[in-house]
Amino acid sequence: MRPGNPEALSLPYDPSRIEPERYAFWEKLGVFQPRPDLAAAPKGTGAALQPVPPGGGAPFVMPPKGTGAKAPFVIAIPPPNVTGSLTMGHVLGESIRDTIVRWQRMEGRETLYIPGMDHAGIATQNVVEKKLRAEKKSRHDLGRDAFLKTVWEWKEQYGGLIFQQERRLGTTPDWTRERFTLDEQYSHAVLTVFKKLYDEGLIYRGRYIVNWCPRCRTALSDEEVEMVETDGHLWHIKYPLKDREGHLTVATTRPETMLGDTGVAVSPKDPRYTGLVGQFAVLPLVRREIPIVADDMVDPKFGTGAVKVTPAHDPNDFQTGRRHGLPEIVVMDEDGKMNDAAGDFRGLDRFEARTRIVAALQDAGYLEKVEPHRHNVGHCSRCNTVIEPYLSWQWFVKMAPLAAPAIEAAKKGKVKMFPARWKKVYLHWLENIRDWCISRQLWWGHRIPVWYRGEEMVVSLDAPEGDGWTQDEDVLDTWFSSWLWPFATLGWPDDTADLKRYYPNSLMVTGSDIIFFWVARMIMAGYHFMGEAPFAHVYFTSIVRDAQGRKMSKSLGNSPDPLAMMQKYGADSVRFCMVQTPTGQDLRFDEKALESGKFFANKLWNATKLVNMRMGGEDLSGVKESQLRLTLADRWILSRFANAVKDVTRNLKTYRFAESAQAVYHFAWNEYCDWYLEMAKPRWALADLGDAMTDEQKADLRTARWVSWKVLDGILRLLHPFMPFVTEELWQSLPHDGETLAHAAWPKAKKSWFDAASEKEVSFLQGVVVAVRNLRVESKIAPGKPVPVFVRGEASQLDLLEKLASQITPLARIEKLTVSRDGSRPPVAASAVVEGAEIFLPLDGLIDLDEERARLAREAEKLLTDLEGVKKKLRNQDFLAKAKPEIVAKENERLVQLEETLDKLKRAQQSLSSVRE
């Protein structure tokens, strides 16, 4: 047992002082590194954190019997962009992840918390190119090698800022294992995967329609496109028929692409156009003859029922064109400007071209009408530019074969998602999955390992032998590297010791916004390359919104600076606020919640100072529980502590972080600080007797000290995963075992401490004290003025009150407590009812009788309302038919209690009425 350092609490609670000091303390001790000495788990037991199902069940998947080992607990940080800085969304995720990691560490598990960063191809290249533009330069001015050198220099100077911020939050990854997706080892894994998939026939190159960002000048995956509802127009354009009178009217939202039309499509079921199928129309402005084809993709109810077919600029038209053998004419360049195929409109920006083309159609008499039209328009998720469906050569992954085991994993429960509703979203996407475009027209990233020489093509991690080979200019999608995160961070493709020990991971905690980008793909990669799921569970964090319910964003300016919040309130307060997000619900962030967290930390600070002071330096390490003289208050707080341990642990196991945090908060503040410490004060005061204490008094004092310290120690352990800094500081001030609270054992709910009888008795005591306090306030009697109290009730209640009198009188400032066994009561008194017992506070000469009558009238009115509500419920046949029998029984019990209480209240009203007479 190490002696505490109570002098550390001599200064007021100041998180800005203690938090940096404590983080440095943990790092120096090596707290964040995994400790294989804690357990030696066999392979395959890493996926260990299993929530308890409703009704109970084994909380963990433990190693096989006979191993005597606990499985390692492994979790990875979703790698933030190298350009990133801490947001409230990051704070939420990191607070939850670190809470779990710290808890598992205290449970005696070997924990590995893997940090790392994503090179973030588009985002990082955009940042550096913006810097170059400010210098009147472009990446092309520098050339590829010089540009990449500039990006690496930028990364070394500015990258990783977010990890410094996460340290401030108190997160505990093993920083010695920090990974970067462009590290040499990780890059080797990425390129190895490309070659493996290519050799298996799952990667191919083709000329297809892709999502193209003219600003970033690269292809985007479907998941990188954000659909924005936009007010646009529907232009109705006349397409003259060839060699006959008349025309077809075509409706389009994108007239600028009509220059690339190579057909007009109608529904084969549309009788209006049956005679025109196989004929030709003449493309306005261009005068190109284009066929009229019948295709099932046409909705006869949309627009005119005839649609233009532009195979090079629309994904649906691309498929239609392939079915009918239509030419594919690209009319734009990669920067969104019209090319030579656009004729007179060449060189114009696509939106300027739209305006000019509509004007030309109007002038030539081809424009029939224009209608307002609200529709979804794709935008680049990185720069918010309107994307362009664009025909180009790209590399793709065939996803259907990879998706099959990932679908089965979710359906059979091998991978579980929390909240469970995300399973349906996940399965819908996988069951309708499209091939993944993985090539990007960037320079920053993993360059595609494909080499060309004339007509030859070689897929190789290294340049082929011989001269004349050139490497593919494109790089791989950033997500093509991050989908390997659970095993590439452990050394794959090499068969490393880390990979054997720590794969699969135990849990993934991430945002639901990347369920497709990342989570689903990680599961696919895990099964394909490792033969098993990368983790057993996925917990999806909530969206952080402001007090008005708006999603936090830079554009709205409604996202607070997390560092400023931590400086003002402390990282502990920020963490404690964030983890109280109800599972499956968005978090409405309110700064007042941070104030509450700081008040709580300060409450614990002062309580610990008090306990330290009252312990008087006594060494309690050798005290055995059997030697103690436990009072009712002691038995009650130990029982409540055992229940708190059970509640906090159960809720952590089931990912109910809010309920877990609230359980320890309620116990620490409302029960330990507000009640037990007050009840212990009379025994603490025995120390003032010094040598005059009797042996019994010494035992009473030692017991009060031991229980106060033991329960406070347990509170700090329960709270440590949520509020690590202040709990470590307070724990170090108390006598303790070990060097750090971070490695202290998680509390256990000791069976012998559960004491329902003591809890029931103290509940009655609390009810009486609260009732007397409330009567004082309502009767406007000074808080410090001792008052007499009379109690009338059942014999068992009166016996208990006499037994508890020494506890009740100081807590309620009672001058004299009188139990009325003959049914008498003061003639003029304020009254309350506690569990059927009547509490009377004599008022003769102390209060205004009219005010007391008004108070009783208000209480009676409330009771009548409650009584009518219960009666109405019990008259409801639907309720009686559907409710469980025990629920109906409780309502009947409540009815009886309300009627009895109302009857006693009426008698009190009659008593006051008789006084006036």
Name each model feature, range by range.
Residues R288-V293, E473-Y503, N670, D674-L677:
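Active-site-adjacent "gating/activation" loops or surface patches in catalytic cores
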Residues M1-L49, P53-P54, P59-S85, R105, ...:
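Non-catalytic terminal extensions that flank enzyme cores
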Residues R102-E110, K131-R144, Q164, R168-P173, ...:
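Secondary-structure transition/capping motifs at alpha-helix termini
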Residues E110, P255-D335, Q362, A812-E815, ...:
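Catalytic alpha/beta core of large soluble enzyme barrels
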